[in-house]
Amino acid sequence: MPKMKTHRGSAKRFKKTGSGKLKRSHAYTSHLFANKSQKQKRKLRKGAIVSAGDFKRIKQQLANIK
């Protein structure tokens, strides 16, 4: 059986935290900021943790990420 390759698109989008969870950035942060409130833009700056439902699939794609 060949080795599992890391999904490079996922590797660029997710980082593993110290406790083993996966951190992601928010969507809606690339353009069209004039239509968004200051509160929404401020909340989008912070990272978020990947939900439990998506965690298993993404973890499999990032098999070799330390």
Swiss-Prot record:
Molecular function GO terms recorded: structural constituent of ribosome
GO biological process, one term: translation
InterPro entries: Ribosomal_bL35, Ribosomal_bL35-like, Ribosomal_bL35_CS, Ribosomal_bL35_sf
Keyword vocabulary terms for this entry: Ribonucleoprotein, Ribosomal protein
Listed GO CC annotations: cytosolic large ribosomal subunit
Record region (Disordered): 1-45
SUPFAM superfamilies the record matches: L35p-like (SSF143034)
Gene3D superfamilies: 4.10.410.60
Biased composition (Basic residues): 1-26
Disulfide-bonded cysteines: none
Family statement: Belongs to the bacterial ribosomal protein bL35 family.
Stated name of the protein: Large ribosomal subunit protein bL35
Species name: Bacillus velezensis (strain DSM 23117 / BGSC 10A6 / LMG 26770 / FZB42)
Taxonomic lineage: Bacteria, Bacillati, Bacillota, Bacilli, Bacillales
Gene name tied to this protein: rpmI
